């Protein structure tokens, strides 16, 4: 049974890759700037009145995020947390001109909610939901690649935050500090570890993107790296990967090429979770599985190191290593 699931997952990944090649990659790449949220970003919550949606919408508002409303077809026309409730995301967009949506919709309906947001041309869609069927996300992935209006972060992710300005997700806001380090991660809890360390070292964060641990993320490492490399406020980058797939190896190749073309390369520090995971066993996330001898932590470490990335063998040293790398630039 497990072998069948592993084979299916591998096949889906291959199908997705070939499908993406057929579509126009340049279209979806145009949405990368949509990730740069700020204090003016207006946010709609899909699944607004549910327990999780309510809790995290309130926390976002407390942080200063401009939450302008939410959706619930059964409660359209009412208010919740002092904000309007709309029947559809299309109606919400017409009334609020929102810049982003946060998806707190149960797994069976979440892909549909994402597709509705794409149809409504929401610039940034942040899908927090875990457990969305992979066939559904494969369909969403193909839809994303055919358009240039909406950018997806997630699913199964902690979200995205620009410290001191805007929070869309479930991350603990108090550990963040405005600063100069861009953080991108497949792991939620390890994201918080990197955030806390860069706060403690007084570097702070320019933008933190939790891309999620599912096999078909709306935003990958390379998307985030492109944003960070072009962002003048980002001086260093922390990349946290996991076993499984080839996202980290792809990122390594991109970093190698990008830094070769820059007069002053931006330092990158990386940690890969799951180094002790046995072959063929899924570790936590749906995408964290070593299959067919590929996707091992060792292979990822090797690829990243060859690209000039500073490797952290423990998550506890991410903060100190990025400080060391930044100090090297001063000498």
Swiss-Prot record:
Intrachain disulfide bonds: none
Gene Ontology molecular function terms on file: nucleotide binding; succinate-CoA ligase (ADP-forming) activity; succinate-CoA ligase (GDP-forming) activity
Active-site residues, record numbering mapped to chain: 285 (tele-phosphohistidine intermediate)
Residues that, per the record, bind substrate: 192
Primary location class: mitochondrion
Binding annotation for CoA: 49-52, 75, 128-130
Pfam families listed in its UniProt record: CoA_binding, Ligase_CoA
GO biological process, any: succinyl-CoA metabolic process
GO cellular component: mitochondrion; succinate-CoA ligase complex (ADP-forming)
Subunit structure: Heterodimer of an alpha and a beta subunit.
Name of the featured protein: Succinate--CoA ligase [ADP-forming] subunit alpha, mitochondrial
Organism: Schizosaccharomyces pombe (strain 972 / ATCC 24843)
